[in-house]
Each structure stands twice: as C-alpha cells, then as structure tokens.
Amino acid sequence: GEEIGGHVVSGHVHTTAEICAQEETENNREVRFRLRDREIVKYILPKGFVAVDGCSLTVGEVDEKEGTFNVWLIPETIRATAFRVKNVGGSVNIEIESSTRAIVDTIERYMERKEKEKTG
C-alpha cells in the first residue's frame, strides 16, 4: 500500500478555534488559531498533528498560556482545501489527534496516581 500522509482523521469535532492571524510569505501561509476551549491546548504539541476543518496539519508553535497554535500551509494545501477562502476572525473545527490524546491522558493519570501514593 501507499504511505499515509498526515494522520488518521475520524471526523470528531473536539472544539472550535478562531483564526486570529494569517501571514503570507514567499512560499506559504502562516495561520494562527485561538482555541475556544483552552484546556484542549495540552493535546496540541509542536510538530504534532491536528485536524483543522478535517485537514490533517502539522503544528508549528504552541502558546499554552494564550491557547493558540500555528500551522504553515503550502500553496497546494491552500489551493485544494477551504483554506483558500478562510479569513481572520473565521471559525474552524478542531480534531485532536487520537494517539496524542491517549498518551497525554495516560501520563496525567499515572502522575496523579504517583502523587497520591506519595501523599498517601
């Protein structure tokens, strides 16, 4: 079979985000999103995956305090998706990558258990 580009997207919408900034550069477009539910940011990791309006994208930078993250779109992604008509202030659907969510939740449960054992 052929290689899967990106990650498996299930179509679940975990939250929405607002496009808070866009900047065109010579070869791509940087888009910054502000999450509606900021606690979701713990699942969005630099160089990790996130689905934005069903499109699998690689995360650039994450600002946990502000609940924002950015992606870089190449011209082909802009051309082939709805990103060609998205503007600052617009809303998008966000799907968290399932294995990242499972890993973060597992580590949190483990750390909580260890803390309880310590304070026991």
Label every PLM stretch briefly.
Residues G1-G120:
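Conserved loop->alpha-helix
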